[in-house]
Curated annotation (Swiss-Prot):
Keyword Hydrolase among record annotations: yes
Alphabetical list of InterPro entries matching this protein: SNase_OB-fold_sf, Staphylococal_nuclease_OB-fold
Active site positions: R151, E159, R199
Origin species: Saccharomyces cerevisiae (strain Lalvin EC1118 / Prise de mousse)
Protein's UniProt name: Probable endonuclease LCL3
Residues the entry annotates as binding Ca(2+): D156
Subcellular location: Mitochondrion; Membrane
Name of the gene encoding the protein in the UniProt record: LCL3
Length: 274
């Protein structure tokens, strides 16, 4: 083979190799940006994700009965989380929820009516509360992390004490239940919209070893710790409104959780009143 032909072949090989390397690099960049980029705040989530895709991550903080903070971990272990990319470590609580919000359990009912029915109702309410207050909250909330605030779709949990306003009955119990169920655990989140507080309204799914995949909003309704969302703005059900209303009806008919009360003010009514 002549020297000129040999040089031409080498040049062609180099060109092909360069094209392959360039193509591979561009593919890797595209794959990373599309599938492995971490969303660190609500506004980072692309519009193409809403209503169509699920995000995987860890719950690092639960501050209320129907919302929490979500640390996005795209790709999971295959995306490098836990061996190439650090995952926030939770701090063990070392305390039960009963100690953390003992004020809820020890709440005094100032009722001077000694009629047996009244005393029986009060006892039933305390008993209903106690089953939630005894739940273990294994971790403390982690703050100051790049997380997305998530608002559970389709439901409203009883309000806790805010800005000097009193808490609703079962407000603390709903918080404890949610902390027990998801704090420090991995969940899947399906973004649906963004509300007026810049929270991502989403359907949330988590794995239960005894029952498989669970819809978090639905589980709260089943246990009587939330009602179907009543608002007219940012109303999101992800095509599950009928199912949510059915299980709310079951919880109400069985007097589970907050439905044990004879007189009940919904979270929506409470917010309008104050």
């Amino acid at each position: 083979m002549r020297e000129g032909d040999s040089n031409s072949k080498k040049s062609a090989d180099v060109a092909v190799l360069s094209i392959i390397l360039t193509g591979s690099t561009l593919t890797l960049i595209y794959t990373y940006k599309r599938y492995l980029t971490q969303f660190k705040r609500t506004n980072d989530i692309p519009r193409r994700i809403f209503r169509k895709h699920w995000l995987y991550g860890k719950v690092t903080s639960v501050g209320d009965g129907d919302n929490f903070h979500f640390f996005h971990m795209p790709g999971g272990i295959r995306g490098g989380w836990g061996w190439l990319r650090p995952v926030p470590q939770m701090i063990k609580n070392g305390s039960t929820a009963e100690k953390l919000v003992g004020d809820s359990r020890n709440m005094r009912f100032f009722n001077f009516n000694w009629i047996t029915h009244g005393r029986s109702t009060k006892s039933k309410i305390q008993k209903a509360k106690s089953q939630f207050l005894k739940l273990n909250v294994p971790y403390k909330n982690r703050k100051n992390l790049p997380t997305i605030p998530i608002r559970l779709c389709g439901i409203d949990a009883p309000e806790r004490a805010h800005f000097g306003n009193p808490a609703q009955p079962f407000g603390n119990e709903a918080l404890i239940w949610l902390q027990n169920r998801i704090l420090g655990k991995k969940v899947w989140v399906k973004p649906l919209s963004i509300d007026q507080y810049n929270r991502c309204v989403a359907r949330v799914s988590y794995w239960d070893w005894f029952g498989g995949w669970k819809d978090l909003s639905l589980e709260m309704l089943k246990d009587g710790l939330a009602v179907v969302y009543e608002g007219k703005v940012n109303t999101e059900f992800d095509d599950r409104e009928d199912k949510y209303r059915y299980y709310e009806f079951l919880a109400r008919s069985r007097k589970k959780g907050l439905w044990i009360q004879n007189k009940f003010e919904t979270p929506g009514e409470y917010k309008k009143r104050i």
